[in-house]
């Protein structure tokens, strides 16, 4: 069985070795045929903490890594040039 893959945007990188990726699914409504967008948020494993907020990434399904984490970062498609500000 093939592993599932999704493409989405990093919406949170505040956890250690974990990012939250928002994936937008578009499909036609069964009755009205209007294109409906639904956003699903996945927690994905990022072992080197390389992803930043706003990055476009490809995630793949993996074994359960924690209570809510079943996806891993496969590659970063578009890197944002944001830098993190350190609060003092």
UniProtKB/Swiss-Prot annotation:
SUPFAM superfamilies: Nucleic acid-binding proteins (SSF50249). Pfam families: Ribosomal_S17. Keywords: Ribonucleoprotein, Ribosomal protein, RNA-binding, rRNA-binding. GO terms for molecular function: rRNA binding; structural constituent of ribosome. One of its GO terms (biological process) is translation. GO terms for cellular component: cytosolic small ribosomal subunit. InterPro entries: NA-bd_OB-fold (IPR012340), Ribosomal_uS17 (IPR000266), Ribosomal_uS17_bact/chlr (IPR019984), Ribosomal_uS17_CS (IPR019979). NCBIfam families: PRK05610.1, uS17_bact. One of the primary rRNA binding proteins, it binds specifically to the 5'-end of 16S ribosomal RNA. Belongs to the universal ribosomal protein uS17 family. Part of the 30S ribosomal subunit. This is Small ribosomal subunit protein uS17. It comes from Prochlorococcus marinus (strain MIT 9312).
